[in-house]
């Protein structure tokens, strides 16, 4: 069953699954998907077409990533055509509510604040929290996968340092909630958020910021781009994140309020995709993202 689904996703690349959008608004007959195309390993832009990519609407470029793998799976399972629209992060929800797209498949977390504007599918991936750091700044024995750092250890390590993240994502909120506003009188600063994760990673690489929090697949993708200088700093995040923030480590598909038909279709389709298959698709996306450069 698993092999058939994954082979079907790969085979789908040989089919023409794209169509033009109706300027008067989208319908559920076509999956019109909004994403940044700049959020590795969930989605990014490439000039090369491959079995893993889909063309970006009204562009000569292509989108790759975990979100594209999920889009291909949904297209095959629901037997619907797909359009990929490249949008800035801050434009995703407004575009959904303006009927310019009918789905946000962009590594977006289902939060109470976003729920005020849109609905969400069931999660299509749940991740761990980790940090991106320069190898030269942190002892190699600290924050390993086998021995993740505790909250107190993180506070001590980050004392006097600056943290950075992409704007409008849960990791950026975590910086203030758990580190800048810590109760142990540690002085931890919040660097201005960057527009994308690669730009935030550049801050870490250039020494402007000390560390960047994000979902583990994102951190792994950033380290793959510069294995000589960057590494993953693992932490025992379950020991300090609230239950709501733990939920924030999962990503879901954004759907316009009232579009119950599409929401039910997406949830039924996602339920067929096992955790093992999702992990395999993400591992492939993370590996491919290393072909890009910071």
Please identify what each model-predicted range represents.
Residues 46-58, 71-79, 152-159, 166-195, ...:
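Ligand-binding cleft/hinge of the Venus flytrap
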Residues 22-24:
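Bacterial signal peptide processing site
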Residues 17-20:
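C-terminal motif of bacterial Sec signal peptides marking the signal peptidase cleavage site
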Residues 90-97, 107-117, 173-182, 202-247:
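A ligand-binding cleft/hinge motif common to bilobed small-molecule-binding domains
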Residues 145-147, 151-189, 264-294:
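Ligand-binding clefts/hinges and TM-proximal coupling segments of bilobed small-molecule sensing domains
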Residues 37-38, 125-133, 216, 226-270, ...:
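Periplasmic-binding protein-like
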Residues 76, 81-157, 236-246:
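Acidic, polar ligand-binding/catalytic clefts
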Residues 26-108, 116, 193:
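Extracytoplasmic small-molecule ligand-binding "clamshell" domains
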